[in-house]
Amino acid sequence: MRPSGRAPDEMRAITIETGYTKHAEGSCLIGFGDTKVLCTASVEERLPPWLRGKGQGWVTGEYSMLPRATHTRGNREAARGKQSGRTQEIQRLIGRSLRAVVDLEKLGERQITLDCDVIQADGGTRTASISGAWIALRLAVSGLMEQGQIKDDPITGKIAAISCGIYNGTPVLDLDYAEDSNADADANFVLIEGGKIAEAQATAEGATYDEEGLMRLLRLAQIGCAQIFKSQDEATK
């Protein structure tokens, strides 16, 4: 039995509120259960020096957590003077994931930064960030197209992410904090609509598992991402 009482293949409720901030070109507040992440897309008509003059744009991501997003207050990374390795890993993951579904040449010589700020954490913050960042990106790019700044849509498809794990010997979908902190194994999958895998991270925590165990987690991820794709459609139509 899962602590939440959910079935093994049952996700937490997905909530999405678009246009959450008025200044960003695209924004949403996404929730996977009690995990809440504010995702904003900022369009800048400039590029990193190493990309200038190459006829393409860039999509990158940043990630942070509010000090009291978790059970106990954590110090702001700015106060510590450096980002943690976890933060750097997650924001690189966000950038890689979004670039997997963007034609950078069609984007033109501009940069879009996806800022993912965790307001409340209850497991799955990186997966909610990626899923919400795509919505913010979609809204920002649609705005550029409506303004005539981009002719052809540079977004090639939808991308979403979800966590899975083995909890009390059972493969389960969309781990919350109680499950994640006690899971025998956990995995994060980033999937493109249509079946392609953009990223897979799998770790044995308390026990190892075989190939079939990994495939069972992947099948759960496919179930979860199908639900996220539907929610993304509804949020951006």
From Swiss-Prot:
Keyword tRNA-binding in annotation: yes
Any single GO BP term: tRNA processing
CDD domains on file: RNase_PH_bact
Coiled coil (residue ranges): none
Catalyses which reaction(s): tRNA(n+1) + phosphate = tRNA(n) + a ribonucleoside 5'-diphosphate
Top EC category: transferase
UniProt entry keywords in alphabetical sequence: Nucleotidyltransferase, RNA-binding, rRNA processing, Transferase, tRNA processing, tRNA-binding
Keyword field contains Translocase: no
Binding site for phosphate: 86, 124-126
GO molecular-function term, one example from the UniProt record: tRNA binding
Assembly and oligomerization: Homohexameric ring arranged as a trimer of dimers.
Function: Phosphorolytic 3'-5' exoribonuclease that plays an important role in tRNA 3'-end maturation. Removes nucleotide residues following the 3'-CCA terminus of tRNAs; can also add nucleotides to the ends of RNA molecules by using nucleoside diphosphates as substrates, but this may not be physiologically important. Probably plays a role in initiation of 16S rRNA degradation (leading to ribosome degradation) during starvation.
Family, similarity comment: Belongs to the RNase PH family.
Listed name of the protein: Ribonuclease PH
Organism: Erythrobacter litoralis (strain HTCC2594)
Gene of this entry: rph
